Amino acid sequence: MRYISTRGDKTERRFCEILLEGLAPDGGLYMPKAYPRVSGITMARWATLSYAELAYEILRLYIDDIPADDLRDIIGRTYTRDVFGTDEITPVRQIEEGLYVQALSNGPTLAFKDMAMQLLGNLFEYEL
């Protein structure tokens, strides 16, 4: 997967190159040069996966310069009961017919940002 700047710099970079870089040199954000397509069959299969398994399946489409086993391990260490207090990681509860709420504050800081920041910290540790 190659990434380019949102501000027009066409220099292509890989995930591990941009991970620690932050903003692109032209001040833009990085975005995939092209987005992968996911079939309905694949999405139906994904619906049966745990949070960590689903995260792996999605992230491997965007991160191809970390070996699959390493990426699976990083994700497996990130999304755990020990970190998020539940095996569901982000439990969804039905409030009433047609109305659901998803808990995104089960992480260490009790904020939704834990969903990304716990993974980002483990990715930094891997790359450094």
Segments and roles (model prediction):
Residues M1-L128:
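PLP-dependent amino-acid enzyme catalytic core
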